[in-house]
Amino acid sequence: NQSAWQGVKNYGTKNNLVEGNKGYNYFVPKDPQDYQATINKVLDNDFSTIIGVGYTLKPNIVKAAKNNPKKNFVLIDTHADKIQNLASISFKNQEGAYLAGVAAAYTTKSHTVGLILGQNSKEMDSFKAGFIQGVTASSRKLHKHIKVMSKTVGNFSDINKAHDIAQEMYNQKADIIFQAAGKSGQGVFKAAKEVNQTNPVGQKVWVIGSDEDQTKLGNYQAKGGQPSNFTLTSVIKSADVAVEDLANQTAKGNFPGGKNLNYGLKNKGISLVQGNLSYHTWIKVQKAKQKIIDGKIKIMANR
């Protein structure tokens, strides 16, 4: 959400638009039951282009697009139906997740890693597929068997449940967990912090963040008081790049209605930060990234 909003702000600033109901604005539903009321509020303010972030908004945005044919609608993180005033922006989550799998495989000492997803969906499947393929391909090169544990929280806002799942994985010898669970993911960081605060800095467990650079969430004090960080790396989804691209197209009269714009490593919609990765591991990640861009590594979006 923050990244998409940044893209809107970037476009607005460059085109002398004012933040507010006469230029560009940001509306946040309290929960899924509030989606329709929030969309109605946006429609009342007479914006010409309305962007919905997250695949759970799809039914409401599709309905609004059909009922308001003179307005442009955009869905982020899912494929839209072929409606002339509705475009969609999707991301090759499997590409970033594959790189996270490479990073995890080359970093793990316990040969056990975990994956925690928000809920069961096609979009979440792409994270799982990419991560497992990245770990598997790297483990073959390392001539090691690396176990991948995978669990789903059930939603994107249950911090306590995600914490308990992560705690269980760490107890079962996982030393790295990749979380793609939205707000629920905060629980994974909480569990890692609890483990790490009781251990010397050299015996830490790690978290791989998603959507944005989550380095700050990994700050902690190790046993003995030494400040450290346990965010291994983060898979970045650059919705800001995609939204600004779309806004520029729309301003030129080329709104891509009925189309899906797909962003991955090649067009800078997905990336992975170096974070706390060793130089050796970072080089392995960069080589895998280039092979994906060149089409030499093919990643399935589901398993």
Predicted regions and their residues:
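A residue-level marker of the well-folded mature domains of exported/periplasmic proteins
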Residues: N1-R303
